[in-house]
């Protein structure tokens, strides 16, 4: 199983909607969205995936962006109130995989879901902070989540033992787009070849965007296009 991890920027959401609409996502691909904003595009993407019955993970407590503050600051009778209502209704559909990041607000979210009858066995959980592994063990000691994303590190391997999904940032991001000229072609990943041998049920990455999230954009002096392709040895390489 492949879990492409995106941050829910406008262009990423539009790309996902296009892929879903045109049935271009295989059964083995489950996108993960960490929404950075409560927007009509986000709820439209959810609606499209529900329509075509393709599973998608939506993180309810994103660590970046303004989604959480957008949610809390919604005013009654506003257009944002409509987005919030649609999001909440669609989030209950079985196509949407309820997901959370193990961080400061994870405990309260788990308690909220428990009160509302959400089964922990249906959740996708993201473990990237070792400080919250004890909370993970406490919350999922008797119930194993559907998917547990984690880096390939010894402490995480000891603490997260079941339904493990490898999460890694494979993209070697440069400071400037022009710098990619110095390395026009390079290795990207071989996780798809070995993840089962390493004890994982799936793998996840941030594609050619990378894990780094910047709140504000800027106009670059150069434009870089990144193309991921299969090499002869079945590994993935990226050409800039």
Which residues does each PLM region occupy?
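N-terminal, charge-rich interaction modules
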Residues: 2-8, 23-26, 36-38, 179-190
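Catalytic beta/alpha-barrel core
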Residues: 4-8, 33, 55-62, 96-106, ...
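A short, Lys/Arg-enriched amphipathic alpha-helix followed by its capping loop at the start of a domain
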Residues: 19-27, 49
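A broadly used, surface-exposed interaction patch
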Residues: 47-120
């Amino acid at each position: 199983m492949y879990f492409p991890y995106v941050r829910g920027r406008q262009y990423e959401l539009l790309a996902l909607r296009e892929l879903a609409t045109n049935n271009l996502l295989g059964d083995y691909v489950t996108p993960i969205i960490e929404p950075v904003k409560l927007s009509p595009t986000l709820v439209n993407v959810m609606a499209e995936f529900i329509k075509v019955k393709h599973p998608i993970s939506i993180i309810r407590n994103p660590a970046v962006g303004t989604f959480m503050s957008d949610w809390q600051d919604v005013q009654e009778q506003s257009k944002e109130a409509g987005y919030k209502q649609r999001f909440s209704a669609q989030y209950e559909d079985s196509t949407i995989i309820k997901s959370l990041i193990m961080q400061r607000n994870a405990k309260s979210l788990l308690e909220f879901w428990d009160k509302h009858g959400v089964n922990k066995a249906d959740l996708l959980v993201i473990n990237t902070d070792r400080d919250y592994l004890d909370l993970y063990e406490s919350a999922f000691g008797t119930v194993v989540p559907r998917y547990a994303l984690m880096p390939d590190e010894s402490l995480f391997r000891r603490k997260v033992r079941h339904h493990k999904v490898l999460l890694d940032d494979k993209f070697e991001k440069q400071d400037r787009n022009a710098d990619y000229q110095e390395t026009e072609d390079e290795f990207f990943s071989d996780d798809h070849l070995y993840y089962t041998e390493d004890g994982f049920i799936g793998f996840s990455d941030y594609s050619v965007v990378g894990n780094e999230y910047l709140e504000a954009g800027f106009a670059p002096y150069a434009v870089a296009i990144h193309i991921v392709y299969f090499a002869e040895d079945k590994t993935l390489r990226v050409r800039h």
